Design a protein with these regions (language model features):
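Aromatic- and glycine-enriched glycan-recognition loops and surfaces
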Residues: 43-52
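Residues at the C-termini of beta-strands that transition into short coil/loop
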Residues: 117
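Surface-exposed amphipathic alpha-helical tracts and adjacent flexible/coil segments at the periphery
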Residues: 1-26, 30-33, 37-40, 54-55, ...
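Short active-site loop/helix that positions an aromatic residue
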Residues: 104-109
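Short, polar loop motifs at secondary-structure junctions
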Residues: 99-103
Length: 653
């Protein structure tokens, strides 16, 4: 079931079912979560039982559950993946998010399919092809600008999904192989080693140092708060928050922030609506700056900018809160712009390194001045001079609000009570239009105090506090003011609410697999390099079916043994350091950027620059010891050392 053209979907991440529930309660219209396997997040999997219990919880609010199955699959994994998809379909999940086109060749139920960001969707041609082969929703590349987003929206009937917040992969998604080349851990299989967060020294083609030991491939975090209206106008309808590794506080906070932002836009513009049911009330003030982030950027949505990198540190340093005045043996004295509290997380930057500590005890010593006793005094603090900047990356009092009930979500219901003295008829109608009728037989006499009786009936019917509903309207259509004992009225109302729950769940309609277009589409390329991530025979059959003639194996197949682009990125270090030939020359024919090098210890990577599309290619070579390892996902690779030990003959004696 695609998102209607005027409905906006806020899509939140969930590491587990508990976080998924809180995401929904804090305003998510849909949640994406990993299943038992193949979910592109190595340590964020969930059992079928947990997902099966999560689905009806979500559907009571009209919210959807999307399960990620977005790794590339080895041939040995196809049958287990097929079984898993069948099991997931039976739990009632709404859609699968997939990368591997081999899945479309499997014998699977008619479940709705979404194209993962790992599919690297940057062009109109590719987006239209994926829509035509059966994808209902497509996640576009984070690097696209508003004009490109609009062009894709206008060319396809697929729902456009776009990341609006969270960590940014420096490479185009699905186009990063540096982790596998260096460690054997494949990003396309959910096990990225995050080489992009390491410090590097940048050298020019003469070996001169341009930048020394900075985190040159580490991006700031995505934040599209200011661009939501423009993204809506460009055709985005699903607004995705990154973060399936993030904790509950992060998901609560960021979901609440974007719920409020989108609700304000919906209220202001009469042509939009949210994609699920209910209204959400938050019991805290959301702040994108108080949970993990590396600084904020809107990336390339409006234009290329020079400050998209978090070069100093990939860690969360928080907000400036003051200055260190003095460092003593067991405490520090600080001047601050905001009050401090016991338990706050504080830090200073020393030589590009974050030196952090937890405030065990704080004591106010003067106006805007505190004495802080850390839980453990970092030795490096004694190296700083007076007036060194102080940051806070954990606001203890604010975080405490998130550990409690921090949101409430309720669905509107209209209540009508009719009938006569021998039978009461109660009708509940939800905001989606689902209606139930419940009757109560008895002898209900006229009340002595008509006004009081009518008020009691209205108040009693509106008491929905133990349900997910709130009374939008209460209408009494009785021949007179009848007296109904509170105990009977309460039971009557509770039974009706349970009936409405069941009716709404029964009326919920999930989407199904979109049929392939007729005539069948043709893939826009006839030759696929390893960058297409084709790792199994079913994926080969898929691409051959749609006109591809020559298909190279995925990088994880270990057929690319020489130097190749192990990362392709829109981030350009020449641009970041004002060394871009485009900045200096106006003639496109004269653009020529000489290679550079990134150095981390013994690891040397060559940087090549493709100036026409403004891309940087990080060139590397897979390590020899990785070539000798079993292919990721193969039966051999899945056998653990303990399993191998069990096959050895036992020693005698």
């Amino acid at each position: 079931m695609t998102v209607s053209s005027h409905r906006l979907e806020l899509l939140s991440p969930a590491r587990d079912a508990a976080i998924a529930r809180e995401a929904i309660l804090h305003g998510a219209d849909a949640v994406y979560i990993g299943g038992p396997g193949f979910g592109a997040r190595h340590n964020a999997s969930n059992s079928l039982k947990d997902i099966a219990e999560l689905v009806p919880f979500a559907h009571r609010y009209g919210a959807k559950i999307f399960v990620t199955l977005n790794t590339i699959l080895h041939d040995d994994e196809l049958e287990p993946a097929q079984r898993l998809i069948t099991d997931l379909y039976q739990t009632g999940v709404d859609a699968l998010i997939v990368q591997d086109m081999g899945i479309l060749e499997l014998d699977i139920p008619p479940i709705e399919l979404h194209a993962s960001t790992q599919c690297d969707i940057r062009t109109v041609e590719k987006a239209k092809f994926l829509s035509d082969v059966g994808f209902t929703q497509i996640v576009l590349a984070r690097e696209l600008n508003l004009e490109q987003l609009r062009a894709i929206h206008q060319a396809t009937d697929a729902t456009i999904e776009f990341f609006i917040h969270g960590a940014l992969c420096v490479a185009y998604s699905g186009q990063c192989y540096i982790s596998h080349a260096q460690t054997g851990r494949s990003a396309n299989r959910g096990d990225c080693s995050q080489a992009c967060r390491l410090p590097y020294t940048l050298k020019d083609d003469q070996g001169r140092v341009v930048s020394y030991e900075k985190h040159l491939l580490s991006m700031k975090d995505n934040d599209q708060t200011a661009n939501l209206g423009a993204l809506i106008d460009a055709g985005v309808r699903s607004f995705k928050i990154e973060g399936r590794y993030k904790d509950m506080s992060y998901v609560k906070n960021i979901t609440a922030h974007y719920r409020q932002m989108l609700d304000a836009i919906i209220e202001e513009r009469g042509d939009l609506a949210r994609a699920s049911s209910g209204r959400t009330e938050h019991f805290f003030v959301p702040s994108t700056e108080k949970t993990f982030h590396r600084g904020s950027t809107d990336y390339f949505v409006n234009a290329r900018k020079g400050d998209i990198g978090a070069f100093d540190s990939p860690k969360f340093i928080g907000l400036p809160v003051g200055k260190v005045l003095k460092v003593a043996k067991d405490h520090i004295d600080v001047a601050v712009t905001e009050p401090l509290a016991n338990g706050d997380g504080l830090n200073v930057m020393i030589k590009r390194e974050v030196v952090g500590f937890r405030a065990n005890t704080v004591e106010k010593t003067g106006e805007n001045q505190y004495r802080v006793w850390p839980n453990e005094m970092p030795a490096d603090l004694h190296k700083i001079r007076p007036h060194h900047p102080l940051n806070r990356n954990l606001d203890h009092n604010w975080q405490q609000a998130l550990t409690k009930t921090s949101s409430e979500r309720r669905v509107a219901v209209d209540i009508e009570l009719g009938g006569w003295q021998e039978q009461l008829i109660l009708t509940l109608t939800s905001e989606e239009g689902v209606s139930i009728t419940h009757t109560l037989d008895g002898q209900f006499d006229e009340a002595n105090n008509a006004e009081k009786a009518m008020n009691n009936l209205k108040d009693g019917l509106a008491k929905l506090g133990q349900t997910i509903y709130y009374a939008r309207n209460v209408q009494i259509n009785l021949p007179g003011a009848l007296f109904v004992p509170n105990s009977l009225l309460n039971q009557f109302r509770r039974e009706a609410a349970d009936m409405l729950d069941a009716a709404r769940l029964a009326s919920y309609q999930r989407g199904s697999r979109k049929p392939v277009a007729d005539p069948a589409p043709v893939y826009p390329q006839t030759h696929l390099s390893f960058l297409a991530n084709v790792y199994n025979q079913k994926a080969r059959e898929f691409y051959h079916r749609y006109g591809v003639q020559l298909i190279d194996a995925a990088y994880e197949a270990h057929e690319e043994k020489g130097e190749v682009p192990v990362m392709i990125t829109k981030h350009c270090l020449r641009f970041a350091f004002n060394l871009c030939p485009k900045q200096a020359k106006g003639n496109i024919k004269s653009w020529k950027a000489t290679p550079m090098q990134l150095v981390n210890g013994d690891e040397v990577l060559t940087l090549k620059f493709d100036c026409r599309p403004c891309e940087m290619h990080v060139i590397g070579k897979i390590k020899n010891h990785i070539l000798k390892m079993p292919l990721p996902g193969s039966v051999v690779a899945s056998v653990s050392p303990d399993d191998l030990l069990k096959t050895l003959p036992k020693r005698k004696g």
